[in-house]
Amino acid sequence: SVIKDAEALAAEAFGAENAFFIVGGTSAAVQGMVMSVCKRGDKIIMPRNVHRSAINALILCGAVPVYVNPQMDHTLGISLGMRVEEVKDAIRRHPDAKAVLVNNPTYYGICSNIREIVRLAHAAGMKVLADEAHGTHFYFGENMPVSAMAAGADLASVSMHKSGGSLTQSSFLLCGPSMNAEHVRQIINLTQTTSGSYLLMVSLDISRKNLALHGKEIFRKVVDLTTYAREE
């Protein structure tokens, strides 16, 4: 189908094994991630500053959170990412957890060391889920923090509508090679309509093509503008 063909192009652009169009916002993508790896009673390690959609996913599937408290920057008054040492400790204390969820980046643009978290989690037999609601540019910009797929994460939710140019409410759910794509698709059908808006899906396809062809140039200009603003 044309949708499947467009999803294949998206997977290629983002360096994923599979990609799914999400028309219920990244909230639906995050819920799809959690519910793809957790069932009732399963533990999932996550930062305390996760998006409410992750909490809603726990309510829906009955999974149990193991919270890692992020550090605070008291000068800026913002929360930071998860420290590797604290994730390692959470894995040690809860070896039966099914997954680790990482914000890549946080709402304020702060990244955890996702490469090391992926290494630790996979060594413990856990999946890594990345909420990349604010990380679309990581896949196409130059000298950016590492994207979840490049770091080896198993699933990632990407808000194309925030910094990728698609219409509000449109998003991608990316899968790594370790995931059963058909299982993920079935879970997605639990969290969003089976009659997706073609306006939203077309906007995802167009924005994907735009970033694949011009992403480096676009985000280079963004970096130049922000650098200029800082210096002024």
Located regions from the model:
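Conserved N-terminal alpha-helix of the aminotransferase class I/II PLP-enzyme fold
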Residues: S1-G25
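Conserved PLP-enzyme active-site core in the AAT-like
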Residues: A13-A16, T26-E232
